[in-house]
Amino acid sequence: PEDPQRRYQEEQRRE
């Protein structure tokens, strides 16, 4: 499954 931490880092990188 997709890692929740990876999705959090990707969303924070999008500023």
Swiss-Prot record:
- Which terms are listed as keywords in the entry? Antibiotic, Antimicrobial, Fungicide, Secreted
Q: Which GO terms describe its cellular component?
A: extracellular region
Q: Does the keyword Secreted apply?
A: yes
Q: Where in the cell is it found?
A: Secreted
Source organism superkingdom: Eukaryota
Q: Which GO terms describe its biological process?
A: defense response to bacterium; defense response to fungus; killing of cells of another organism; xenobiotic metabolic process
- Taking the record's annotation, the residue ranges forming a coiled coil are none
Q: Looking at the keywords, is Secreted present?
A: yes
- State the protein's purpose: Possesses antifungal activity against P.infestans but not F.graminearum.
Q: What else is known?
A: Antimicrobial activity is not affected by salt concentration.
Q: What is this protein called?
A: Antifungal protein 3
Q: What is the lineage of its organism?
A: Eukaryota, Viridiplantae, Streptophyta, Embryophyta, Tracheophyta
